[in-house]
């Protein structure tokens, strides 16, 4: 949570998954803000399927702080169904994150933190999984920071 301000860190935490064990599966996430340079090549509203593999990582915050993060464009991605719909069901929101939050950014967008492992996708990997897998984080970042 270092990408949040000191005050935001006091109000937001990363917690253990609600199921109490390690998760390893493909998850669907929707880009809800492309304020971050890391998401400039991702489609706003686009749904991407990437591996999740973690035991900790559920995003927890008060409704007030979640509202502030959304208002500032800091909520970058949310867990969704394969159809792009928000769902509290653990099939889709695999770790029980509040407001289905999967990825957040620093206030200026230059730091991105997310749970799904975009770096684990490649051509020929998970070819039997439905959905777009390349959120183009690294391509976006390289173009912005070069």
Where do the language-model regions lie?
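Single conserved hydrophobic/aromatic residue that forms the stacking wall/gate
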Residues: 1-13
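Amide-donor transfer/coupling interface in amidating biosynthetic enzymes
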Residues: 14-146
